Amino acid sequence: MPLFFSDNLRAALECLLFVAGGPVSVDSLAACLGVKPGDVDELAAELQELYAREERGLQIRAVAGGYQMCTRPEFASYCEALLRPELPALSRAALETLAIIAYRQPVTRTEMEYIRGVKVDGVLNTLISRGLVQEVGRKEAPGRPILYGTTPKFLEFFGLKDLKELPPLEDVAASQENSREAGGRGSIPGHPGEE
């Protein structure tokens, strides 16, 4: 792929993604760089191509409607050895509630409780405090209950570009059934384990 942009613009994009520490929207990057949003996509592709060609330890990923600089997965063990992160795990109840929100959003607390068969107040507050879920409006129904949906941090947490990358519900149900038949308790696909 031929390079169309100057080294300065690619370097500027690299700097912005480095200092951001998380996903940055295409519109924000375009405004900072003084280019069109489509140019940001091209710049990111060029930068990623350079990283791949030079076998760097970093990559540029499309995440949550923008771009993020992150380490390549094959070097994760080195990063873990240095940082020894203690990521707070989500309980099974939190994962179940989060799955309901992700697949049915916007959804009310009452709808979540109906599906789960138990109260979700504590779990919902945990998901909100971790920035994975947010209020997204009010339902046009008596009492105007609050509607909840996922956040860009949810996409980042699960490494998704957008909600379309969620596995189809049929695949999730089949995975749960296969796990139970094999004697397991079932788990959410893409999750390393449970609490």
Swiss-Prot record:
Residues 169-195 are annotated as: Disordered. One of its GO terms (biological process) is DNA replication. It is found in: Cytoplasm. Keywords: Cell cycle, Cell division, Chromosome partition, Cytoplasm. InterPro entries: ScpB_csome_segregation, WH-like_DNA-bd_sf, WH_DNA-bd_sf. It comes from the Bacteria. The keyword Nucleotide-binding does not apply. It holds the Pfam family SMC_ScpB. Its main location: cytoplasm. Gene3D superfamilies: Winged helix-like DNA-binding domain superfamily/Winged helix DNA-binding domain. The keyword Ubl conjugation does not apply. GO terms for cellular component: cytoplasm. Homodimer. Homodimerization may be required to stabilize the binding of ScpA to the Smc head domains. Component of a cohesin-like complex composed of ScpA, ScpB and the Smc homodimer, in which ScpA and ScpB bind to the head domain of Smc. The presence of the three proteins is required for the association of the complex with DNA. Belongs to the ScpB family. Participates in chromosomal partition during cell division. May act via the formation of a condensin-like complex containing Smc and ScpA that pull DNA away from mid-cell into both cell halves. This is Segregation and condensation protein B. It comes from Moorella thermoacetica (strain ATCC 39073 / JCM 9320). The gene is scpB.
